[in-house]
Amino acid sequence: CARSPLSDNQFREQLFARLPPGTKGLEKWPDFAASLHYQPVTYDRQSFLKLAAYLGELDHAQGTGGNRIFDLAVPPGLYPVIAELLGESGLSRETGLAEGWARIIVEKPFGRDLPTAIALNAVLHEHFREEQIFRIDHYLAKETVQNTLIFRFANSIFEPLWNRHHIEYVGIIAAEELGLGSRAGYYEDAGVLRDMFQNHLMQLLTLTAMEGPARFDADAVRAEKVKVLRCVRPLARDEVARWTLRGQYRSYRDEPGVDRGSQTATFGAVTWHVDNWR
């Protein structure tokens, strides 16, 4: 669903038009497309009640049991608005309008700073149980990142050496060749620190420095990541200039939509000290 006033067929035609040339299995498209539906919504309670009713009709017709995943591919400022509307319309299952499960997916940026992140968390918990909430970092889906834990803890060669006695320092580099493109509005507000450091690179830091989890499940891995973050030495205000660096690529201010006097950082470097035995 989205705000554009499309019919099911128009939505399906748009998706079909985006299939790359040479896509295999196109003979199965009609059957697959019959399961694709579109519902126009605006950000108000009446619209979400209509969405709930429409999903109920689809559940009855297709026997889906009310199982739903709400992936909020919207501007971050709308996360709390949509979470409240999902709860008020019964789609979060808090009101028991359906028997199946519900999940809500939100991706970074999760708030602009600590107060807004806490406020967003409070809104989500008002309408969803913690087990229903998925805070996604798409960087973790990269194959190299997913292989990090296996590379470390299933490898009898490297794990015994993965400590301060054998490694002087670890450098984590996320280099991109692409410029700003069409992201000026977002990037001018976020900058490289919010865009990369407090999410993607922090995840890589914890995966690199964490201890082996008791079990390879979400709760156990998360617990070990949190232990790493608690061991990161905080930077005092007078240490920031010593341990951090900010920069901006030369043509950034020439990009469409960027202020000619912009001070937004497109490059950043931080030295962290992890104060644990490893």
Q: What do the predicted segments below correspond to?
A:
Residues 1-106, 110-278:
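Secretory/organelle targeting and membrane-embedding segments
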